[in-house]
Amino acid sequence: MQKTKNTYKKSGVNINLADRFVKHIAKISKKNVQKKKKYLNKDNIGAFGSTFDISKIKIKDPLIVSSTDGVGTKIDLANKFNKFDTIGIDLVAMCVNDLIVQGAKPLFFLDYIAVGKIKFNNLKQILNGIIRGCNISDCSLIGGETAEMPGIYDKNKFDLAGFSVGVVSKKKMLHKKNVQNGDVVLAIPSSGIHSNGYSLIRSIIENKIITKKIKKELLAPTKIYVSEILNLTKNNLINSAAHITGGGLVDNLSRSVPEDLCLNLDLAKVKTNSIFKWIKSNNINDREMLKTFNCGVGFCLIAKRKNMNKIKKYFSKRYVPYEIGFISKDKNKKNIYNKIRW
């Protein structure tokens, strides 16, 4: 009896389907290349490495800023609800929102997608979200990797990682050393949960039937703050900033305040979203909520009080910043007052 020959496809890796996906990427990336043609090489797609002409960036004393991140176990809910069109936006947001904390303009983005089995339509939706996120951020998707890994991932499982690079003038860079006594702390609303705390959420909904409204809120894409923050830095309106991710409001804001000054926060001023009230109703205490979720605040600014009204003009009605605290000289590193009004 003749033995059947082993092939890569039989082991679970479909090169033909992977090539088809690469061709799809090349096709939909043409518009992006045309839009950014003075920076990008039209031959980036399919090359071993991607190029970006930084000599065309007219910034004095430029500093390169980089960030890499993922979307954590939010991907499991995308699988559970069979909805993949927003998770790519999350991936871009988690990277570029970190760049703008230092005032950097995102230049380009690369993605890494690992799957147990290539599912073309699902990957198309994920990629469309990534491109949408790049368009919102005004940065270029210049490369990436899609890895099919049977045996490492279940055939229905996948993971995402992103990498982004930005640039900022040395004089325009946001830094905690710019923060001064008397500065005001402003909260910018989040669009929802963003991309942190999903392991806890998954444990909450494991044996529950949830409504369509809750499903929609659980997968709402992370707000990208690039346009607003870059306008503020361009006009020298803010001193420091914080992206509110894992660790929550207090821990992330503390990273943006110098050691010799005190962060004063009034939690009663925080305007929380309905989804967080729903999460808390599942027997989660205040401390756990604050350490795990953004609780309605996706990004924070530290600025001179006199700049508050000017700052607000750069935001749409839904995302207008509001005061939640101030900076002072104090023996304490931080003073936290009151509780969030759920």
PLM feature spans:
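General beta-strand structural signal in soluble alpha/beta enzymes
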Residues: 41-44, 64-67, 108-109, 140-145, ...
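Phosphate/diphosphate-binding glycine-rich loops and adjacent basic-rich segments that engage nucleotide
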Residues: 150, 154-209
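Acidic, glycine-rich active-site loops and adjacent beta-strand->loop/helix elements
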Residues: 69-72, 112-118, 145-151, 166-168, ...
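Beta-strand segments within the central parallel beta-sheet cores of soluble alpha/beta enzyme folds
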Residues: 64, 107-114, 127, 142-145, ...
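A generic local secondary-structure boundary/capping motif
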Residues: 39-40, 52-56, 97-98, 131, ...
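Glycine-/charge-enriched secondary-structure boundary and capping motifs
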Residues: 2-12, 21, 27, 122-137, ...
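A glycine-rich phosphate/pyrophosphate-binding beta-strand-loop-alpha-helix module
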Residues: 80-159
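N-terminal glycine-rich phosphate/pyrophosphate-binding loops that anchor nucleotide-derived ligands
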Residues: 2-100, 138-139, 150-151, 180, ...
